[in-house]
Amino acid sequence: MERAIFAGGCFWCMVQPFEELDGIESVLSGYTGGHVENPTYKEVCSKTTGHTEAVEIIFNPEKISYADLVELYWAQTDPTDAFGQFEDRGDNYRPVIFYENEEQRQIAQKSKDKLQASGRFDRPIVTSIEPADTFYPAEDYHQAFYRTNPARYALSSARRHAFLEENWH
């Protein structure tokens, strides 16, 4: 098994697209990239921890490639917005591909360059590609939020879904 960590705004919206794929062992919502150990949701939302909401994906590379996961990642985000995603603003919601090793870094960078060259967006692709750090799982009530709180999930993801429909589908 291998690990991928992606930040694309609110972690609630980043679970379902990956969780439903063959070859995915688990998808956890959590926090990474900051300087506070074992942060809470409240602490991360205070924007004082340096952490970003993210998902940790454990996958079987014999069934799905890291490159495939990166391609799906792009289609869940607005890669031209460095200051958050959709309804969620600030560094704790910034888009980041966190890489585990040089191979993942190269795959992510090549994919980002390809997206920039495609002309799909008229603004620069600003999603960061950064080395992975400790991943701290979020509190239980955040896990698989789309299943446990479908009405709240639908409300919180409306702008995201409209953007994705217009720009990716």
Swiss-Prot record:
Q: Which residues form the active site?
A: C10
Swiss-Prot/TrEMBL catalytic activity? L-methionyl-[protein] + [thioredoxin]-disulfide + H2O = L-methionyl-(S)-S-oxide-[protein] + [thioredoxin]-dithiol; [thioredoxin]-disulfide + L-methionine + H2O = L-methionine (S)-S-oxide + [thioredoxin]-dithiol
EC top class, as a word: oxidoreductase
Origin species, per record, is Streptococcus agalactiae serotype V (strain ATCC BAA-611 / 2603 V/R)
| Organism phylogeny | Bacteria, Bacillati, Bacillota, Bacilli, Lactobacillales
What job does this protein perform? Has an important function as a repair enzyme for proteins that have been inactivated by oxidation. Catalyzes the reversible oxidation-reduction of methionine sulfoxide in proteins to methionine.
Name of the protein: Peptide methionine sulfoxide reductase MsrA
* InterPro entries documented for this protein: Met_Sox_Rdtase_MsrA_dom, Met_Sox_Rdtase_MsrA_sf
**Would you identify the family this protein belongs to, as annotated?**
Belongs to the MsrA Met sulfoxide reductase family.
Under the heading PANTHER family, the entry gives: PEPTIDE METHIONINE SULFOXIDE REDUCTASE, PEPTIDE METHIONINE SULFOXIDE REDUCTASE MSRA 2
List UniProt keywords, sorted A-Z. Answer: Oxidoreductase
Pfam family membership, one: PMSR
Q: What is its EC number?
A: 1.8.4.11
Biological processes per GO annotation: protein modification process
The UniProt GO MF terms for this protein read: L-methionine:thioredoxin-disulfide S-oxidoreductase activity; peptide-methionine (S)-S-oxide reductase activity
